[in-house]
Swiss-Prot record:
Keyword annotations from UniProtKB, A to Z: Cell membrane, Heme biosynthesis, Membrane, Transferase, Transmembrane, Transmembrane helix
Pathway in which the depicted protein is active: Porphyrin-containing compound metabolism; heme O biosynthesis; heme O from protoheme: step 1/1
Quaternary structure and partners: Interacts with CtaA.
Catalyzed chemical reaction(s): heme b + (2E,6E)-farnesyl diphosphate + H2O = Fe(II)-heme o + diphosphate
Name of the protein in its database record: Protoheme IX farnesyltransferase
Major enzyme class: transferase
Family: Belongs to the UbiA prenyltransferase family. Protoheme IX farnesyltransferase subfamily.
Xref: HAMAP family: CyoE_CtaB (MF_00154)
Organism in which the protein naturally occurs: Geobacillus sp. (strain WCH70)
Membrane spanning residue stretches: 35-55, 64-84, 114-134, 135-155, 161-181, 187-207, 236-256, 257-277, 289-309
Domain of life: Bacteria
Amino acid sequence: MANLKAIHEQAAHSGEGSRANIRSIWKEFSSVVKIGIVNSNLITTFTGLWLALYFMGEGFLENLHIVFFTLFGSALVIAGSCSINNFIDRDIDQFMERTKTRPTVTGTMEAKRVLWLGIIFITVGTLSLLMTTVTAAIVGLIGAITYIFLYTMWSKRNYTLNTVVGSISGAVPPVIGWTAVDPDFHVVPLVLFLIMFIWQTPHFLALAMKRCEEYRAAGIPMLPVVHGFAMTKRQIVVWVACLLPLPFYLFSLGVPFLTVATLLNVGWLALGLYGFKMKDDLKWAKWMFIYSLNYLTILFVAMVIATLW
């Protein structure tokens, strides 16, 4: 009986150890591929795809294969790009609080494996997008190349415009979604691209203000590091103001959507202007960052809901 009890206890401990090991592996994998970025970009990818189906008069259920290949391929291309970004930035990530525990910094994942993971993911993701349209695959590759070479390897460590350059790749996902259904030019994916492109600069500049000293320690020339908070706040307000006219190019989604989008834009702009009166710049930056996250989610969900009225 004693031996049997010991065996059961050993098995229980072994099971707990296995589960803990799986959780650890998943945590490391999620960190390397930046799972949060992947998930948020899939929201915009899906919205682009959904709107294309809506405007083209195509049924969702009849195109489930397109939905699958688009989301699967996009997820892999984005995850692969983020993996290579981690590989390249492993020397500076150690200086930042939010990145110093990444597996590429701690050494829990071999750098070469992370690089190959990224290459394989981008390759398989591109092949998946090819199952939809060639245009979608090309757009996905443009996003990956822009993120890896123009942003990570070139502008990030050299110019304060790195945020703007990085916004190009971040604006690509909804265009992938649209072109997977309709590869021809249309104003809607252009507007989606512009919304994402413009949104990212105030979003990441607010983050840069919050993490200013970390970026300074890492030697990354973010705008608040080089030109200070006052200049950064002015830039943020200008970029947010540029969002104001864009929803009106999506007037076919209806008045309720235009109302929601306009209120979101006006609210963000008002909060931005309030920053010139606030004395606590870091607190304001935190508010702006949180607002930007909610803004994007609400806006893109509202686009989908608008097609269901």
